[in-house]
């Protein structure tokens, strides 16, 4: 794609009207100038050409180009900010166009680019200084440059468009500088912008070393698996789930440690690689949730929305959609506590992201795609009061328990690979006799399992055992005659569906990886059968 800022063909010459204007004896304005900025769609940025034209006519500031209301308001912000910076607008007709006009633009990120284009038309800065630039930022009425979301995505768009330099708010400069191929310069007010465009050589490039930021990442020592007493089977199930990025459901009474285990799962996942960290940072930046002063997110996300969360908050939404909890948990954990208490609409919206690992939101202006590469961890009580099947404590009638369990649909349960009962702890388990295994020790095994899967799926779409296609499952889960016979007996005894059969094989493959076995053995299958999620009919039959 040609660079809109550096084209010098016949079309460019047609717009250079300063010679015609000077022949009339009224020097002072170039009339037309342009600069690149960027809009946000989904989690990616796209180039927007900001054009400014000054002409004779009634004094007004007109903005066109399929604009949201906050973009149209940029005219008033720019006019006032320029006046307060000592550059009042002339009493002429000023038209600003944001192209392409077929795409709706929203947000206040275009203010700084509009101001730069207008300044060039007024000859306050050299028009050629805007060539090869991408500019974005919000203006206050005093001329201060305010921070904006999505600067990392903007820098990526600049790199893709061949732009070598970006001017962004100072508070966002370190974030944009993560893209090493683009020179990112921060400005704090309009005066700095004018000085920089008059003397480009004075711009100070913002320097950030992403690797050093990752190197400073530290685990959360306050949440370690060594603090969890008892629940050895649930802890083992959590390790298997983390090793293959399998969706994981824990069922047990209140106080059995389900939430404690869930919050410690990020600590046994491998540290983020730079590519993963950049993807997560871009999502949080677009959502406006990047922590102040942080250029790069170095820890895996752990999102735990309340059960009153709506479907829109989970998936993302708005007239111009922004990422929801599902996308914000990409690369990490989405923890849904009290799973049956969530609205049915919120639970059902999980089905597509769990299957396709993306969220698609359709609006009149287009379809927005957000990443959903997360591991679902959920916890629930076995009944409304929480103590079923302990009839000495459970106060629920059988019909109430059946209704409570029936809130989860079978299609949703089909997408959960591992289900584990978390029983009430005994006094001896609570006392914690002996030393429990630490998160660091478990993480070493999980990292080795991830390494094995990386080698296995090199060049393939899948990255983890949980994401294997049916063909890959049959290819990589090699079975001997005894293993095949065991699977046949399990298939007949439990009336497994085809989906449940392949899910069982994927979990068995992960267990084999943890033990560094090339083939899936009988013991791996038996352990995977112990993690088999209940069919909804089985739950209701037990009541």
Regions found by a protein language model. Give the residues of each.
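Inter-Walker segment of RecA-like/P-loop motor cores
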Residues: 295-313
């Amino acid at each position: 794609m040609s660079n809109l800022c550096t084209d010098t063909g016949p079309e460019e010459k047609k717009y250079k009207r300063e010679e015609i204007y000077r022949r009339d004896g009224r020097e002072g304005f170039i009339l037309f100038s342009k600069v690149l900025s960027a809009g946000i769609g989904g989690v990616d940025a796209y180039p927007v050409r900001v054009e400014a034209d000054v002409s004779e006519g009634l004094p007004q500031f007109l903005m066109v180009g399929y604009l949201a209301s906050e973009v149209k308001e940029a005219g008033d912000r720019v006019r006032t900010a320029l006046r307060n910076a000592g550059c009042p607008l002339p009493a002429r007709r000023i038209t600003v166009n944001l192209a392409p006009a077929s795409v709706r633009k929203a947000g206040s990120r275009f203010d700084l680019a509009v101001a730069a284009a207008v300044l060039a038309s007024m000859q306050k800065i050299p028009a050629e200084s805007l060539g090869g630039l991408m500019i974005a930022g919000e203006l206050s009425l005093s001329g201060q440059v305010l921070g904006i979301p999505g600067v990392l995505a903007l820098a990526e768009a600049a790199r893709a468009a061949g732009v070598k330099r970006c001017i962004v708010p100072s508070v966002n400069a370190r974030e944009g500088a993560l893209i090493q191929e683009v020179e990112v310069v921060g400005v704090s007010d309009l005066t700095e912008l004018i000085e920089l465009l008059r003397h480009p050589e004075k711009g100070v490039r913002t320097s950030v070393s992403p690797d050093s930021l990752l190197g400073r990442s530290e685990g959360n020592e306050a949440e370690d698996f060594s603090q969890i007493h008892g629940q050895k089977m649930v802890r083992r199930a959590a390790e298997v789930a983390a090793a293959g990025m399998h969706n994981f459901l824990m069922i047990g009474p209140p106080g059995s440690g389900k939430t404690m285990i869930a919050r410690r799962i990020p600590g046994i996942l491998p540290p983020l690689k730079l590519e993963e960290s950049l993807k997560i940072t871009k999502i949080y930046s677009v959502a406006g949730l990047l922590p102040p002063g942080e250029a790069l997110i170095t820890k895996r996300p752990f999102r735990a929305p309340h059960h009153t969360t709506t479907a829109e908050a989970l998936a993302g939404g708005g007239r111009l959609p922004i990422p929801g909890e599902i996308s914000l948990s990409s690369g990490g954990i989405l923890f849904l506590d009290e799973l049956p208490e969530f609205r049915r609409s919120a639970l059902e919206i999980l089905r597509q992201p769990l299957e396709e690992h993306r969220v698609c939101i359709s609006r009149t202006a287009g379809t927005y795609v957000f990443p959903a590469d997360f591991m679902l961890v959920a916890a629930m009580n076995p009944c409304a009061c929480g103590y079923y099947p302990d009839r000495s404590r459970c106060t629920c009638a059988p019909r109430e328990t059946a209704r409570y369990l029936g809130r989860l649909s079978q299609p949703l349960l089909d997408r959960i690979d591992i289900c584990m009962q978390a029983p009430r702890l005994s006094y001896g388990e609570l006392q914690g006799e002996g030393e429990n295994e630490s998160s660091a020790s478990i993480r070493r095994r999980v990292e080795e399992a991830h390494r094995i899967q990386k080698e296995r799926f090199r060049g393939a779409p899948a990255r983890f055992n949980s994401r294997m296609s049916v063909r890959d499952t049959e290819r990589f889960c090699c079975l001997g005659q005894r293993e095949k016979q065991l699977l046949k007996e399990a298939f007949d005894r439990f009336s497994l569906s085809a989906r449940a059969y392949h899910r069982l094989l994927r979990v068995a493959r992960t267990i084999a990886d943890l033990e560094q076995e090339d083939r899936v053995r009988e013991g791996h299958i038996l352990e995977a059968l112990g993690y088999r999620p209940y069919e909804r009919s089985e739950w209701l039959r037990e009541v």
